């Protein structure tokens, strides 16, 4: 359970517009990687126009005089390993790629079908947004509106015109990638929060694409503002019909302008903060979770949003954005209805004027993409000379001075073309029927838990079956006299006298006669002596200084006298403890620890079997026996457990505490306090219970695609802890495959903390081989001896704890802990590979399954963000995997998000969605496979554009919609 070497503290990047920080200019290409301006040939752009930034019609936050205020340009932060949350790294390159991916789809539907510029214009410089009612250029620049409408009105009088129009309609999407291949497209999210610099760059691109000089560009700023409203309403009537149609075609999904860590910054100094709902601004409210550990235990507890992609998942899964999407769709549909009626009125006016003049009007207008790119549906490429756009500045001035109606410039449209146009529009609208997006229900923001009340969840011992009599068997080793087992009495060891086995199937004990040590006799000859006798001699000396303890340990570990470091132990003794505490340590606690350690052959009389891979075996021993074994581990007496590499016990965790004594980490004194609290308690009063260690190895797993079991009940909360609020439940240890992780080293995250406050767990490291993919370790009966505060670097021993857990018929505390190790993903996308998903499902299923036990006798699973944090797991995927595994094992789930309220709501919404639609385990698993195929397999960026939960919502709704139609397959 280690955060690993990659978890280093990260600093915030300066935000533009913050105090003392100025936004880079639009011309600074270094500030916008991959976004350099494209300047066309000067002859293609003889005249440039700028929209005055002080225009009152401009929308605040996009452009205008607020250059000094906080902009909405929010950069992704580096991972911050803090108390509540973990973010993953995100490079500038990946951010650029991701923005490109998210912007390409809506932009493609906005690109014109025609090549409006014959003057060698190969690329479209800047594609405007589709949100017509919020475009700042539309509100502030009347001449843009006039030019836009003129572009809409370009029609050819020939009868073949309608055929070209209908034939060219599909090209709206197919031609877009070619036009956008090298276009200077704004890569920031399409929200109300464009920065001033970004908007200036947009306007510059529009101006370079304008090869004519318009007459009304010479108007004053005041005139432009006064006329903008009336001009805009008149010019947008014809354009909105096609614009609304194309908006449905594009299926635009607006992304959030906010990052998880920037919600507070955006809210200050911006005029758009009234648009933020509580859920948007609350994405980064909960303080982040700090994750630190050593390489042995990179397992960590995540928030969630463990990574940059999570935070992105939060943005995608937020119901606020979906509501905005629906509002945009409704507004576009309304625009379609209005503009259709207005278009018919315009056509009638056109015919009257055409008959009066008696001659064909041929006008060529310059289309400018500054306000409404959606009008491209009305513009098909004309043939012959009519495609040339030879409009000079003089003709533009004349049109501007006459101030004529825009409908004066329409060419007569034949009636046959009118009918064809209407039929085409009807067909287009029918084909565009969309499946409505699922919007998760709004949940009360003040709720601390959601789902089934925790009081209704099954707990031990009330839900359990009556245990059979405790008896040893071929699959169960019992090291005490079961016939003398009494409540409140210290169990008697079995057999009565010590039995030694020195082989590769049992623990090699320090007190074994085979534990020999080279010594020199009186004649100087080297002979083999008993190492146990040397241990007894060394430890029976009095310890008044830490140096005495160091010398005693090295006396029987001579080979490591120059390798082992005791700095942490010396500093703890000399610098951390008060004089009275140090005196109590060497006068009382250490002598008692020596006594119980040297009683090992009288307490642990039976050889302890090694729990090797592929074994299904249990070991039940007394708490007193465990205390004696741990005292020997503290004094580093276990033989053959210090060598590394390909040694005999290289596939087993460390058991001797020598690594706990090294270094100057601030974690070590708190670890030593916690362990000395345990040793003081068990030496002052002998414990009377039993503890069972079970290695479970499964060969048969569900066929996940065909598993028809429904999801079980869920209680999810962002408050509390697994050990504190999951009493009587199956409590998940987010384990390292070497159980205990870095508990005897520098690790101090979820697993290590649990092993410290329940130190009897540490003895499992003595005999449990590294876990395989289909295995878990189940520990029942350990007692909690300490309370703590903090996490990782902030961990502090608080006080001694009296465990009030009930005891079962075997005199075990009703505390069941399962150690399951998750995979370590170095690439975010790897965890969605079907083989990896199946492995994690099998691992969780192995930990949750109890063969032969009825579901009504199984307690709920108390778990959390398993395999997240330093292991790179996505919290939402891991939550769904655990829900599926628990459903297959027929157990309820109590999920702790460790302070992440947004994750709590997301998990609950997903669980509610799946259960209401009666999606069983197999159907959800197939959705996970489909997500990999459609979103992850061919993804070139670090993370997919569509996050998991939004994809499941849409895919499940699409499948339900399709299944309602006869003859259609569901696609899941």
Curated annotation (Swiss-Prot):
Region feature (A-domain): 1-452
Locus of motif Nuclear localization signal: 10-16
Assembly notes: Interacts with PCNA. Interacts with NUDT5.
A Pfam family matched in the record: PARG_cat_C
Region (Disordered): 1-239, 253-351, 369-409
The reaction(s) this protein catalyses: [(1''->2')-ADP-alpha-D-ribose](n) + H2O = [(1''->2')-ADP-alpha-D-ribose](n-1) + ADP-D-ribose
Comp. bias (Basic and acidic residues): 87-100, 193-205, 342-351
Protein name: Poly(ADP-ribose) glycohydrolase
Residues with PTM Phosphothreonine: 137, 197
Keywords: Acetylation, DNA damage, Hydrolase, Nucleus, Phosphoprotein
Tissue spec: Ubiquitously expressed.
Sequence positions bearing Phosphoserine: 69, 135, 195, 256, 259, 281, 286, 293, 297, 311
Superkingdom in the source lineage: Eukaryota
Similarity remark: Belongs to the poly(ADP-ribose) glycohydrolase family.
Binding site for substrate: 722-723, 736, 750, 791, 865-870
Catalytic residues in the record: 733, 751-752
MF terms (GO), sorted A to Z: chromatin binding; poly(ADP-ribose) glycohydrolase activity
Primary residence: nucleus
Gene Ontology process terms (BP): ATP generation from poly-ADP-D-ribose; carbohydrate metabolic process; detection of bacterium; DNA damage response; nucleotide-sugar metabolic process; positive regulation of DNA repair; regulation of DNA repair
Biological role stated in the UniProt entry: Poly(ADP-ribose) glycohydrolase that degrades poly(ADP-ribose) by hydrolyzing the ribose-ribose bonds present in poly(ADP-ribose). PARG acts both as an endo- and exoglycosidase, releasing poly(ADP-ribose) of different length as well as ADP-ribose monomers. It is however unable to cleave the ester bond between the terminal ADP-ribose and ADP-ribosylated residues, leaving proteins that are mono-ADP-ribosylated. Poly(ADP-ribose) is synthesized after DNA damage is only present transiently and is rapidly degraded by PARG.
Ranges for region Catalytic: 605-790
EC number: 3.2.1.143
